[in-house]
């Protein structure tokens, strides 16, 4: 009930103490991480509050004739954490992680327990389909959760070097089921793009764009332009909205998105300031007792949203996703609830493309 912003400092303080840190050092690191985590979630909340009305207006104005509505991850996670499967799957996943670490099958120590909701949801769906009184259904539900999280831990290890290179997340992996599942597509797509003559030579990096565009290539201006464009697209197509009101919304949304692109990297930096001492203590603890062993701290993909292209790509994808929803045959789902969280879908695209916006856009369209 206290939420991640309270529990994470407690977890990291205890972890620091276990690793041999003094109480003051462990508490400072845990509190700093908690403040950064709370700040990061606050800014992400600002982004969602800003973009959700814009996305809703776009959907309403385009008058889509789709029969099912995307209700978003928040509803899905709330459902997942409220079923009979929770205690059994939760314990099974923790045991799986511990066993895999002890056996040397993974280097990821997953402390991002809130995102267990993915496997909780799939386990609950199995029980709903087969019945909670079916013993085989329980075996399958728990078994699939353990296998899925096992694959997630392995993929988190595999992608860790890329997260360190692109986002500077040293000693951190992302055992996030959604992110890992998308990486299974973006890595092969990036490999294929690297084989196409001409395409493989296109590199749109944040540094290159900033150099070519000057002021317009800076995060604050990119945020204002992208946010303003989306607001214009939404409000100038709304019947009965005055030009003055539309222009007002363009500036409001533009400034809010600009603030998001500037503030998120700073919150991630504060989060990392608290995390790095714990990570270093963990590595020192392992080196002393298990020479040659390495351990990554598994966190939510939110810590990777500090890269300018993650937010930018997620926002650019909103109109693309809406167009695809209409033109793709047999699609009946109206994208809505998760439109504001598309930057989280952009994370594995930026990772696989090594921060190349051109490839990231292609990968985002495909997934």
Q: Could you describe each region identified by the protein language model?
A:
Residues 1-43, 84-296, 300, 304-308, ...:
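Signature of multi-pass transmembrane helix bundles
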Residues 29, 36-87:
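Membrane helical hairpin/interfacial module
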Residues 64-71, 89-90, 284-287, 309-316:
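A broadly tuned preference for mixed-charge, low-complexity surface segments
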Residues 49, 73, 262, 266, ...:
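A short glycine-/small-residue-rich loop at the edge of a beta-strand within enzyme catalytic domains
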Residues 135, 248-261, 314-321, 332-367:
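Alpha-helical transmembrane segments of secretory-pathway, organelle, and plasma-membrane proteins
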Residues 71-72, 91-93, 360-365:
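Alpha-helical transmembrane segments of multi-pass membrane proteins
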Residues 302-314, 318-322:
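N-terminal signal-anchor transmembrane alpha-helix
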